[in-house]
């Protein structure tokens, strides 16, 4: 199954190409990318009902909307800081359930495969991984907050 990063790369490649439509099917998962008239890519994905984790549909939004991130985002200027961004529009959850503790907090050590949060989109819960080894420096969003595509969620000091 494709992960969020691979889907994002496909969207970018299709958006920059002359291809109008792309369809991917594998193991019961169907992904359809189709350009609208304005040249933006629309993503439609149908996931199987059995798995708990599934990729949610996502729409590519203009880069200008990324600037709409909250003013609380004041990243420390350090070349080793990596931003973990939201791969989709949805609701940010710091833990797997209301009773559970957060996946990570400031000071938590993470590796590339560490789940740092969940972003819910259309009743599908998508686990977001750190994708870098290091230490969480700052959590930039609140639990239950609506997040935009590309919005920074965490700052990680990369090792």
Curated annotation (Swiss-Prot):
PTM-bearing positions, type N6-biotinyllysine: 123
InterPro entries: AcCoA_biotinCC, Biotin_BS, Biotin_Carboxyl_Carrier/Decarb, Biotin_lipoyl, Single_hybrid_motif
Keyword Disulfide bond: no
Keywords: Biotin, Fatty acid biosynthesis, Fatty acid metabolism, Lipid biosynthesis, Lipid metabolism
Region named Disordered: 53-77
Biological-process GO terms, alphabetical: fatty acid biosynthetic process
GO cellular component: acetyl-CoA carboxylase complex
Pathway(s) per entry: Lipid metabolism; fatty acid biosynthesis
UniProt domain Biotinyl-binding: residue ranges: 81-157
Top-rank taxon: Bacteria
Biased segments, Low complexity type: 53-74
MF-aspect GO terms: acetyl-CoA carboxylase activity
Subunit structure: Homodimer.
Role summary: This protein is a component of the acetyl coenzyme A carboxylase complex; first, biotin carboxylase catalyzes the carboxylation of the carrier protein and then the transcarboxylase transfers the carboxyl group to form malonyl-CoA. Binds biotin.
Protein name: Biotin carboxyl carrier protein of acetyl-CoA carboxylase
Organism: Bacillus subtilis (strain 168)
């Amino acid at each position: 199954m494709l992960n969020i990063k691979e889907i994002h790369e496909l969207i970018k490649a299709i958006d920059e190409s002359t291809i109008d439509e792309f369809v991917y099917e594998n193991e019961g998962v169907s992904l359809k990318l189709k350009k609208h008239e304005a040249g933006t890519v629309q993503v439609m994905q149908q996931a199987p009902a059995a798995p708990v984790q599934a990729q949610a549909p996502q729409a590519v939004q203009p880069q200008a909307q990324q600037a709409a991130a909250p003013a609380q985002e004041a990243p420390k200027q350090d070349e080793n800081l990596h931003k973990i961004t939201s791969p989709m529009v949805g609701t940010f959850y710091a833990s797997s359930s209301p009773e559970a503790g957060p996946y990570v907090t400031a000071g938590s050590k993470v590796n590339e495969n560490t789940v740092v949060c969940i972003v819910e989109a259309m009743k599908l819960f998508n686990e977001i991984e750190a994708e870098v080894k290091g230490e969480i420096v700052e959590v930039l969003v609140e639990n239950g907050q609506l997040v935009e595509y590309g919005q920074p969620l965490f700052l990680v000091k990369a090792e």
